[in-house]
Amino acid sequence: MGLEAQRLPGAEEAPVRVALRVRPLLPKELLHGHQSCLRVEPERGRITLGRDRHFGFHVVLGEDTGQEAVYQACVQPLLEAFFEGFNATVFAYGQTGSGKTYTMGEASVASLHEDEQGIIPRAMAEAFKLIDENDLLDCLVHVSYLELYKEEFRDLLEVGTASRDIQLREDDRGNVVLCGVKEVDVEGLDEVLSLLEMGNAARHTGATHFNRLSSRSHTVFTVTLEQRGRTPSRLPRPAAGHLLVSKFHFVDLAGSERVLKTGSTGERLKESIQINSTLLALGNVISALGDPQRRGSHIPYRDSKITRILKDSLGGNAKTVMIACVSPSSSDFDETLNTLNYASRAQNIRNRATVNWHPEAERVPEEQAAGARGPPRHRSETRIIHRGRRVPCPAVGSAAVAAGLGAECARCRARTSAAYSLLRELQAEPGLPGAAARKVRDWLCAVEGERSTLSSASGPDSGIESAPAEDQAAQGTSGRKGDEGTQQLLTLQSQVARLEEENRDFLAALEDAMEQYKLQSDRLREQQEEMVELRLRLELAQPGWGAPGLLQGLPPGSFVPRPHTAPLGGAHTHMLGMMPSTCLPGEEVSSEQQVVSGKEVKAEVLAQADKLRSASSTTSEEEGEEEEEEEEEEEEPPRRTLYLRRNGISNWSQRAGLSPGSPPDRKGPEVCPEEPAAAIPAPQAVGSGKVPVQTRQAPAAMASEWRLAQAQQKIRELAINIRMKEELIGELVRTGKAAQALNRQHSQRIRELEQEAERVRAELCEGQRQLRELEGREPQDASERSRLQEFRKRVAAAQSQVQVLKEKKQATERLVSLSAQSETRLQELERNVQLMRRQQGQLQRRLREETEQKRRLETEMNKRQHRVKELELKHEQQQKILKIKTEEIAAFQRKRRSGSNGSVVSLEQQQKIEEQKKWLDQEMEKVLQQRRALEELGEELRKREVILAKKEALMQEKTGLESKRLRSSQALNEDIVRVSSRLEHLEKELSEKSGQLRQGSAQNQQQIRGEIDTLRQEKDSLLKQRLEIDSKLRQGSLLSPEEERTLFQLDEAIEALDAAIEYKNEAITCRQRVLRASASLLSQCEMNLMAKLSYLSSSETRALLCKYFDKVVTLREEQHQQQIAFSELEMQLEEQQRLVYWLEVALERQRLEMDRQLTLQQKEHEQNVQLLLQQGRDHLGEGLADSKRQYEARIHALEKELGRHMWINQELKQKLSAGSTAGQSQGCERRSLCLENRQCLGNEDGLHPAAPEPLWQSSLLEGVSRVWDESRDLVHAPLPLTWKRSSLCSEQGSSEESRVRETTEPPVGRVLPMGEVGLSWNFGPLPKPRWEPRRTSPGMIDVRKNPL
C-alpha cells in the first residue's frame, strides 16, 4: 500500500502521510518469553493494540516487511515529488530501540547486506539513477549532515565547526535556513555513503539497558538538488535564468526513554531529559497542528530547535512522511500507545507544498564559482555534442558581415573553450584508453601553443577563453577602422577556420572516448549482473539448522552496530541457535537414542564445516596463485568509469528498477505471535506441543557474506581515493607544464634583469664616481650644490633599484625550483596510486574467491538441508512417542489423585514410599560418591604422571651436567700428566746444561746460561700450572659457577619431586584400598537395590517414578534458568564484539577521510599555484607586451581627451567675452570649423608623440587643475532661453559624427580619475594647435552638455 504523491501545478495541499512499522521481537525479549501485544492488518491499514484499541494509518508495515517494501511504500513517491521541485521530508519517530536508525539506513552502511540497506542509501541510489538516465537534465547535488545534541548544533561533516557558528534563520520567503553548515557537492552514491559513514562515526551514541549503541541526539541528513535545462511535466515553464531548487530532509529522531527502564544515570540521564523535552515540544507541535479546534492558533515551533527545523515539514512548504516505529513487546505497551496516539494526530496535519523556482541571479557566489569550474561530465558532453554543428563562415565586405563574423568567432571560441575544459577533465579520468589519451594530450598541447601565439600576436582579447562580449566589442571597434579592420577580419576568418578544424578533431576524439566508456560500462554492468545473480542464488540456497554452537562462527561484521533496533534475519531463532540441544523441551525425557542422534548430527556438522574450511582455504590459495600469474601478464587493470563512480559497485540500479507496485525481492523475518511460546515454553507446558526446527545461515556462509561486503566497501573507498589521487596527479601535471612555461619566461626575465642590473651597476659606479668628484671639490654656488644633491638622489635610487632587482632574482630562482618539487610530488602520488590499485586488485581477487566459496557452500547446504529434513521426520516420530508417554503419566497422576481404583492410599503406604525414596537417595549418593572418588583417583594419577614427567626432564638435565663434570675431570687429569712429563724432561735438560756449563769454554758458557734461564722460566710456569690444576681437582670446581648453581638447584628440585611422588603414591594407594572396599560394598548394594525394587508393587514403582520425574523437571528448570543467563552473557559479548568492530571500521574510515581531505587540500593548493603561475606568466613575456600596448593606447586616448577639453575651455572663455549676440550663421560656421579643427588636432597628435619633459610637468599640473574647475562650472551652467536645441543648423548632418564620437570618446562632462590624469601628465605635454580658436555655436555647447 503505497503513498500517492499528488502532483498539481503550483501550490497544493499535501497532508502528512503516516506509515507505521512494527519491528520483530528481539532475541532478548524472546529469551525472557515476552508476548506480542499488536495485531497487524496491512491490507486494511489497521493495527490493534491489546484487545480493543484500533488505529488506522496510510501504510501499516508488519514484522515481516523488508527494507525494499518500506522504501517503495514510503519514499518512492516523495522522491518523484523531489525531482519535480517540491521539498520533501521523511522522519522516523518512536521509542528507543524501535528501529528508527535501521529504517533510515544511517547505521553501519558498509556491514549491512544489500537487502538490509535503509531509506537513505536506496533514495540516493534511485536519485543518481534518474539523473544519469536523463542526459539533458543539468543537476547539482549537495548534502549536509547535522546533529542536534543537547539543543546544540553539530556539523557531522565538519566536526571542527563551533556550535555558535551554526544559526537558524528565516529567508524573505519565510523558509527556515541553516547558516554555517558545510554542504558537500557529490557526484555519486559512493561519495554519499562515505559521507554518511563518516557522519555516523562522529555521532553521539551511548549504552543503555535497551541498546548498547543508542542514539543520543537527533540528526538531519539534507540533500539539495538544483536542476536546470528542463521543466517538470504539468508545470508552467519558467522564465529564462531560473532554476529548480528542492530539498529532501531525512530526520532520525532520538527515541523517547523512560528513565526507570533505561537505567540512565549521570550524563546519560541528562541526555535523556533533553531528548524527552525536545520530543515533548515536537509532540505539542503535532497536537497543535492536528487538532481541528486549534486551527489558526499559535503553533509552538520555537520551543525547540528540532521543531524549528521541521517547521516547513509540519504545516509548511513540503511533502512529509512520518514513519512511526513501534515495539510489539508487551513490556513496551505504554510507549507503543503514546507513539500510536502521536502518529494518529499527525495524519490531520495539512501542508502547502509549492514548486521551488529560484532566479539564477539569487545564487550565492560560491555556487556560481562552482558552476564556472565545470558542470558534471556527462552533461558537458551532451552540450558539446549538440553544439557541434558546422556553421558556414560569412564573407568579408561590410560592417554587418564583420559583426556576424565576430559573433561566429565568439561562438567558436566558446565551443573550443568548453572542449578544452572537457578534454582536461577527460584526461584526468582513469578509464581513458592509451590511443585516445595520446590524442587528447596532443590536442591540449596544440591549443596551449596556439593560445600563447594568439596572446602575443593580437593582444589580450585573443585567448581561447576570452569572453564573447569582449570579442564582439573588439571586432565591432576594429570593423570601423578601414584597412586595419580588413586585416582584423582576415585574421578572425583564419582563426575561425582553425577553430572549426580543432573542434572537428575534438569531436572525433570525444566520440572515441565515449565509445570506450560505453564498452567499459557494458562490461562492468555484466559483471555486476553476474554478482547479483550469484548473490540471489546464495540467498535462495541458504538453509540452516538448530544445532548448538553457531554463535562461535559468526564474524563481527555480520551484526550491525545497533543490535536492538533492526529486524535481524533469524532473530526469533537466535535463542534456539545458542541453546544446547539439552535445553529443548522435546529432549527432556527423550530416549537415549535421540540424544545420541543429536550428538551425531552435531559431530557431522562440525566435521563438514572443518572439511569445507580446509577445502576453501586450499582452493583460495590455488586461485590466488593463478590470479597472481594472470595479473602479471596483464598490462594494466581496467579503470573505473563514470557510470561506476555515480552508481557504486553494489547493484543499486537493478534493485531500484522495481516498480512501486511490484512485490519486493526479499521479506523480513517471518514471525508469528505464537512463536515465542514455541521457542521458550513455560515449565507448566513441558512435554506438550511441537518444537519447530528453525533455520539459520551457516557460519561459513555468513562469514563469506561478511567478507564479501567488506571487500566491496573497501573497493568503493579505494576507488574514491584513487580517483581523487588521479585528479591531483592531473593538477600536478598541469602545474608542471605551467611551471615549465613560466620557467622559460623567467629564464628570459632573469637574463633581462641581469643585463639591467649590469646597466644599473654601471650607472651607480658612474654616479658614485661623479659624486666623489663633486664631494672632493668645494661647492662654489647653489647650482653645484643642487647638482650634488641630485647625484646623491640618483645614487640612492640606483642602490634601491639594485636591491629590488636582487630580490626579484631570488624570487625568480625560487619559482624555477617549483617544477622540480612538482615532479617529486607527482612521482610520490603515482606510487600511492599504484599501491592503491594493487590493493584494489587484491580485493577483487578476494571477491572472486568469496563468490567461488559461495558456490561450494550452496552444494554443502543442499546436502545439509536434506539431512535436516530427515532429522525433522525422525524428531516428529520421537515427539509422537514422547506425547504418548506424557499422556500416560498424566493419566496415572489423575488416577492417583482421584482414587479411581476405589481405595485411598493410606498414610502407612505413603510413609513407606517416603522411606523407599530416602533409601534410593542414599543409594544414589553412594554411587555418586563412588564416581567422585574414581574421578579424584584419576586426577591424582594424572598429577603423578605430570610430576614424573617433570622429574624425568630434571634428571636428564642433571645427567648432562654430571657428564660434563666427568669430562672436565678427565681433561684435568690428562693436563696434569702432560705437565708432569714436561717437568721431568726440563729437569733432565737442566742437569745436562749444568754439566755443559762446567765443562764448556768461556764463550759457550754465556750461551748456556741464557738457555738455562729460559728452561727455568718454563719450569716455573709449568709448576704454577700444575698447582692450579691440583687445586681445581682438590676443590672439585670442574664447572662454571652458573652450572654449579644449576646443578645444585636440580638436586634440590629432584629431591622435592621425589618427596611429592612418594606422597602421591601413598595417597593413591589409600584411595585404591578405599575404592576396592567401596566397590565390593557397592556391588552388594546394587544387588540389594535390585532385589528391593523387584519386591515393589506397580503402584509403588509408579509413585517413585513420579517423584523422581518431578525432581528431574526441577533440575531441568534450574538448568534452563542458567542457560538463559548464559545466553544473555553471550548476547552482551556479541554486542561488545560489534562495538569493537564498529570502532575499527570508524577508525579506518577516518584514515581514509583524512587522506581525502589531504588530497583535496593539495588539489586546491595546486590550483592556486596554477593561478599564480598564470598571473606570473601574464606579467612576463607576452603579458608585459600586451600591458604595454594597452597602456600606450590608453595614454594616447587620454592625451586626445585632454587636448579637446583644453580647446573647449578656450572656446568657452571667448564665448563668455563675446556675449550672446552671435547669430545662427556664425554658430554654424564655428561648428563646421570646430569639426575641422578637431580633425586637425587628431592629426597633430599623431605627428607629435608624447615625450616626457620634466619642465612641462609642473606647469601642466597647475593648468590642468584650473582648466578642469573652469570647464566643469561652465559646462554645467544654465543656458539662456534663446539657445534652443532645435536651432542647430547641422544637427542632422552631424548625427553620424556624434554617434561615432560617443562610441569612441567619453562624455564631455565626465571627470577622469586621478590615476588616469596622472598617466597623461607623466607622458608629455599637449601639442599646441596651429590655428586660432574661434567661437562655437550655442547649439554645439548644448550638445556637449547633453551628448545623449
Curated annotation (Swiss-Prot):
Residues 480-542, 698-1057, 1109-1211 form a coiled coil. The modification Phosphoserine is found at residue 903. Residues 15-349 form the Kinesin motor domain. Residues 358-479 are annotated as: Interaction with DLG5. Disruption phenotype: Mutations appear to be the cause of the matariki (maki) phenotype, characterized by expanded motor neuron domain in the 10.5 dpc neural tube. Motor neurons are increased in number and expand dorsally. Mutants die at the end of gestation, when other phenotypes characteristic of elevated Shh signaling are apparent, including preaxial polydactyly. Knockout mice have defects in developmental patterning and die at birth with severe malformations, including exencephaly and polydactyly. Residues 451-486, 607-674, 1288-1314, 1328-1348 are annotated as: Disordered. Residues 358-1211 are annotated as: Interaction with SMO. Changing residue 130 to P: In maki; expanded motor neuron domain in the 10.5 dpc neural tube. One of its GO terms (biological process) is positive regulation of smoothened signaling pathway. Expressed in heart, lung, liver, kidney, testis, spleen and cerebellum. SUPFAM superfamilies: P-loop containing nucleoside triphosphate hydrolases. ATP binds at residues 94-101. It comes from the Eukaryota. It is found in: Cell projection, Cilium; Cytoplasm, Cytoskeleton, Cilium basal body. GO terms for cellular component: ciliary basal body; ciliary tip; cilium; cytoplasm. Residues 620-636 have a biased composition (Acidic residues). Keywords: ATP-binding, Cell projection, Cilium, Coiled coil, Cytoplasm, Cytoskeleton, Motor protein, Nucleotide-binding, Phosphoprotein, Repressor, Ubl conjugation. Can form homodimers and interacts with microtubules. Interacts with GLI1 and SMO. Interacts with GLI2, GLI3 and SUFU. Interacts with NPHP1. Interacts with SMO and DLG5 (via PDZ4 or guanylate kinase-like domain). This is Kinesin-like protein KIF7.
